[in-house]
């Protein structure tokens, strides 16, 4: 029986150690207090070039997840205004994606993702740790 437990532990450790989501994205800041009317800049760094499509998603206070942007090439930019916030996404380099959030009226959490393909069939999405923004 103890051999089975050791085998299970080894399999669990191997799956954690080889989990690609651990090192695919670095997102910051992790949280920020934002005075009403002030803009905040978020940054996402891609750690693995096999997943070149980078996106931003927002999650509102009701935990609803909503896609915002997907950008592939350096210097790509997109702007979007939604109830509660205005967004400007910029693909700075092959490995860096930025998001400026302005005119926030309520808090939200923003997630950077990466995937191997773009379009409607993105395949597996890998999420960053999230940036929780709280409006003062």
From Swiss-Prot:
Positions of region (D segment): 117-120
Q: Name one GO molecular function term.
A: peptide antigen binding
Annotated region (V segment), positions in chain:
21-116
Key words, A-Z: Adaptive immunity, Disulfide bond, Immunity, Immunoglobulin domain, Receptor, Signal, T cell receptor
GO terms for biological process? adaptive immune response
Which Pfam families does the protein's record reference? V-set
The stretch of residues making up the signal peptide is 1-20
Q: What are the annotated disulfide bridges?
A: 44-112
The record's listing under InterPro entries reads: Ig-like_dom (IPR007110), Ig-like_dom_sf (IPR036179), Ig-like_fold (IPR013783), Ig_sub (IPR003599), Ig_V-set (IPR013106), TCR_variable_domain (IPR051006)
Q: Where is this region: J segment?
A: 121-136
| One of the record's GO cellular component terms | T cell receptor complex
Q: What else is known?
A: This sequence was derived from a T-helper clone.
What is the designated name of this protein? T-cell receptor beta chain V region E1
